[in-house]
Amino acid sequence: MKNTYRASNISGFNWWGTVIGFILSTSNRFYIGWFGIFMFPLTGLAIIAYVAAFILAPPVDIDGIREPVAGSLLYGNNIISGAVIPSSNAIGVHFYPEWESATLLEWLYNGGTYQFVVLHFIGGVSSWMGREWEFSFRLGMRPWIYLAFSAPLVAATAVFVFYPIGQGSFSDGMPLGVSGTFNFMLVFQAEHNILMHPFHILGVAGVFGGSLFSAMHGSLVTSSLLAETSGDVSLNVGYNFGQEDETYSISAAHGYFGRLIFQYASFNNSRSLHFFLAAWPVIGIWFTALGVSTMAFNLNGLNFNQSIIDSNGHLINSWADLVNRANLGIEVMHERNTHHYPLDLGL
């Protein structure tokens, strides 16, 4: 049953009651809600600032050594190489709004735009998740929609907020661009060896497994639609929006898949099936976010990066050794100054 908030519920019926009724009404074509009051301005400011910085921003002194890096289209980048450059290492993790700098140019030079975009974006996306919960609550629905959306939210928060805080500087955050994303991935691998971490492995299983399961489910449903029309008419014509009857035969899909693999590999309960489809990728991404958040503080005890030694103390070459050597190479190339050595090579 709809839990609709109407202006008539407010005594006196004044203009404020009309506004509240409009915000909380579930009859609107586009639901706003209390969280929407925060979501729209925060997300809008983040988008406007990102587009402006991607096109126009001057170079940013990301390393804090007076060697600014250009990321905008105006300074010669393209769609692939362009990015919003993270805040300067000289700023660290300090909150750096525009009024903390002497001039706007100084704020831009120190990468204040990055903090502006990231913090407004995280706030806007968090408000979106809260809006999902609020809308579900007012419609009398279960809260699983917002819970599923928490996976990409915690992943973004881990990369843009937790990791820079743990490393001591927003300059370690992920640049907001295509090539910047890959650069962040390579540096993260070099410094933390995330590919050999079990939480990352669970995340990969969640994402790729979720894609596989969704494709399997969609193909099984599409292949077992109940025909309500003649052979020369599309099956879609026989479907009426909101109909109570099922549109496909889950028993046929269950029987097909059970014989294709084995009986217990398929679901005979639609609710269990769809819960599994939602839970698998969400839990995997949760673990990835947890792995990034722990590595942010250099807590890496679960990593499988130890060399294999036999009983005589001789090294048995393994894939872990190859990855470790590759990590050292990436880390050396990442350091742009010869007087800055990677921690692993420092004596």
UniProtKB/Swiss-Prot annotation:
The keyword Nucleotidyltransferase does not apply. Pheophytin a binds at residue 128. Fe cation binds at residues 217, 274. The D1/D2 heterodimer binds P680, chlorophylls that are the primary electron donor of PSII, and subsequent electron acceptors. It shares a non-heme iron and each subunit binds pheophytin, quinone, additional chlorophylls, carotenoids and lipids. D1 provides most of the ligands for the Mn4-Ca-O5 cluster of the oxygen-evolving complex (OEC). There is also a Cl(-1) ion associated with D1 and D2, which is required for oxygen evolution. The PSII complex binds additional chlorophylls, carotenoids and specific lipids. GO terms for cellular component: chloroplast thylakoid membrane; photosystem II. GO terms for biological process: photosynthetic electron transport in photosystem II; response to herbicide. It is found in: Plastid, Chloroplast thylakoid membrane. One of its GO terms (molecular function) is electron transporter, transferring electrons within the cyclic electron transport pathway of photosynthesis activity. Chlorophyll a PD1 binds at residue 200. Its EC number is 1.10.3.9. [CaMn4O5] cluster binds at residues 172, 191, 334-335, 344. It comes from the Eukaryota. The record marks 163 as: Tyrosine radical intermediate. The chain crosses the membrane at residues 31-48, 120-135, 144-158, 199-220, 276-290. The keyword Oxidoreductase applies. Coiled coil: none annotated. Photosystem II (PSII) is a light-driven water:plastoquinone oxidoreductase that uses light energy to abstract electrons from H(2)O, generating O(2) and a proton gradient subsequently used for ATP formation. It consists of a core antenna complex that captures photons, and an electron transfer chain that converts photonic excitation into a charge separation. The D1/D2 (PsbA/PsbD) reaction center heterodimer binds P680, the primary electron donor of PSII as well as several subsequent electron acceptors. PSII is composed of 1 copy each of membrane proteins PsbA, PsbB, PsbC, PsbD, PsbE, PsbF, PsbH, PsbI, PsbJ, PsbK, PsbL, PsbM, PsbT, PsbX, PsbY, PsbZ, Psb30/Ycf12, at least 3 peripheral proteins of the oxygen-evolving complex and a large number of cofactors. It forms dimeric complexes. This is Photosystem II protein D1.
